[in-house]
Amino acid sequence: MSGGGNDFDDRVLGRATGVDAPPPPPSAELLRAVESTKPVRTRTRFGAAAVVALVGLVGPAIVLVHGPLRRDLAGLPAAWLIAAVALWGSAFALSLASAMIPRRGDVLPAPSRASMVAMAAMVVVALFALLATVDVPGQSMLPAERGWTLFESCVHCIGTVAKVAVVILIAGLIALRRLVPVGGSRVGMALGAAGGALGGLLLVFICPFASTAHVVLGHVVGMVLAAIAGALLMFRK
């Protein structure tokens, strides 16, 4: 009786004061379940980007090992070659990082930063191609030597860039699935620009054509088209 009376008193007091009776203690099963839980392993900031980069580098590495390399490679100025590798390589690394790695304290990549980095990378390599492309007289090849027009040589190199970029795009899209609810097209643009820059880096070593027109229309345009493809693939209404 006393137990029932206390329950009744608690209910009456709760209604009068607006304070309900205290909840019952947790069951033994609930306590055991809580004690057995383990912290969820969070995504690393660089792990996914590193995996995508490694997957994308496999193809170019195989091509460089088996060759052939451009016939004028030995005659190119060392400073120019270092600058070209640094610029195309930085465009690849920075674009990929902006698409895959959130800023410190964030959970998801920042679309605005990704698009800005990608556009800056494309502008820099375009200016380098326009203003600093070099050839080696007597060693650099002209499209006519293969029976090609300038347009045909550019289409060939755009195709090479596309083959490299598609690997980065597929690997990146898999890694980023369901992680970019908004701004996906801008992240996709950065991802495509990264793939295009990696293709351009490969062409530094294997493309025999060294005219400014070819490098701009074949290599840089290839990167731009890869960025557009990435934006379209990740476009979300």
Q: Residue ranges of each PLM-predicted region?
A:
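Polar, acidic low-complexity tracts enriched in Ser/Thr/Gln/Glu with frequent Gly/Pro and Thr-Pro motifs
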Residues: 45-237
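Positively biased amphipathic helices and basic secretion/translocation or surface-docking motifs
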Residues: 8, 12-56, 69, 233
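N-terminal acidic, proline/glycine-rich, low-complexity intrinsically disordered segments
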Residues: 1-8
